[in-house]
């Protein structure tokens, strides 16, 4: 059965994401953490392109969705969990192993839930923090420590706790913004230009601030909604 060559194009981005994820694992296993971490960030870019290319070329398919999920497990599940383990987790023996394994398991659950709820969920938000965002937050911590050296003693335990938190957030019902259907205007265009300029000047710091704000936004929004629900219940009681 002949295959439309256009269908190969978005899947090429997905395959490239798997390749970078595997390269990240290889670099992490040889303790070249900076390269390993930036390869995960590069995988994030490819992950953002494959779906958009598929929609632009009208080549979305069930195979592409499943292939993308498998790629995400490798690039954003296995790769960052092994980076975290080889960087800090091994100091804690089986606890470090368990934390790294749980991150992958929660990420896989997050992806499976996303795949079965794609047609029914809110197109403007994700349920649970996306696994690519969680992965990038992990590797940004490693990159920041490689530059500023803040992971020492008890802060290493905090790093492992942070990884567990990210795993829980992936399978939670906390909603996070989905940037797939952004309505562009002049104000947003200017903000994106400013952000890209900051990334050009200080890529690590700019990405860390942006991802940190993204993480906190979902939690604060959830807390606000919980307080609002409790207030409304008390008011009606």
Swiss-Prot record:
EC main group: transferase
InterPro entries: CDP-alcohol_PTase-I, CDP-diaglyc--ser_O-PTrfase, CDP-OH_P_trans, CDP-OH_PTrfase_TM_dom, CDP_ALCOHOL_P_TRANSF_CS
Compartment list: Cell membrane
Cited PROSITE patterns: CDP_ALCOHOL_P_TRANSF
GO biological process: phospholipid biosynthetic process
A GO cellular-component term linked to this record: plasma membrane
Highest rank taxon of the organism: Bacteria
Residue spans crossing the bilayer: 3-23, 25-45, 73-93, 95-115, 124-144, 150-170, 184-204, 207-227
Coiled-coil region(s): none
Pfam families listed in its UniProt record: CDP-OH_P_transf (PF01066)
UniProt membrane topology term: Multi-pass membrane protein
One MF annotation (Gene Ontology) recorded for this entry: CDP-diacylglycerol-serine O-phosphatidyltransferase activity
EC number: 2.7.8.8
UniProt keyword terms in alphabetical order: Cell membrane, Lipid biosynthesis, Lipid metabolism, Membrane, Phospholipid biosynthesis, Phospholipid metabolism, Transferase, Transmembrane, Transmembrane helix
Alphabetized Gene3D superfamilies for the sequence: 1.20.120.1760
Reactions it catalyzes: a CDP-1,2-diacyl-sn-glycerol + L-serine = a 1,2-diacyl-sn-glycero-3-phospho-L-serine + CMP + H(+)
Family recorded in the similarity comment: Belongs to the CDP-alcohol phosphatidyltransferase class-I family.
Name by which UniProt lists this protein: CDP-diacylglycerol--serine O-phosphatidyltransferase
Organism: Helicobacter pylori (strain ATCC 700392 / 26695) (Campylobacter pylori)
């Amino acid at each position: 059965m002949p295959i439309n060559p256009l269908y190969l194009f978005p899947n090429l981005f997905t395959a490239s994401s798997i390749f970078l994820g595997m390269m990240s694992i290889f670099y992490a296993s040889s303790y070249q953490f900076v390269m390993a971490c930036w390869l995960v960030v590069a995988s994030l870019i490819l992950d953002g392109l494959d779906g958009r290319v598929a929609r632009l070329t009208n080549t979305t398919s069930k195979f592409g969705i499943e292939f993308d999920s498998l790629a995400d497990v490798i690039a954003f599940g296995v790769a960052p969990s092994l980076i975290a383990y080889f960087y800090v987790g091994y100091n804690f023996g089986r606890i470090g192993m368990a934390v790294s394994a749980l991150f992958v398991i929660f990420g896989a659950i997050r992806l499976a839930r996303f795949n079965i709820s794609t047609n029914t969920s809110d197109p403007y938000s994700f349920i649970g923090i996306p696994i690519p965002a969680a992965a990038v937050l992990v590797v940004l911590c490693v990159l920041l420590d490689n530059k500023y050296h803040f992971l020492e003693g008890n802060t290493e335990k905090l790093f492992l706790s942070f990884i567990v938190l990210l795993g829980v957030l992936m399978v939670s019902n906390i909603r996070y913004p989905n940037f797939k259907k952004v309505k562009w205007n002049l104000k947003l265009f200017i903000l994106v230009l400013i952000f890209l300029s900051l990334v050009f000047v200080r890529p690590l710091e700019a990405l860390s601030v942006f991802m940190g704000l993204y993480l906190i936004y979902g939690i604060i929004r959830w807390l606000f909604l919980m307080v609002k629900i409790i207030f409304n219940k008390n008011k009606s009681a």
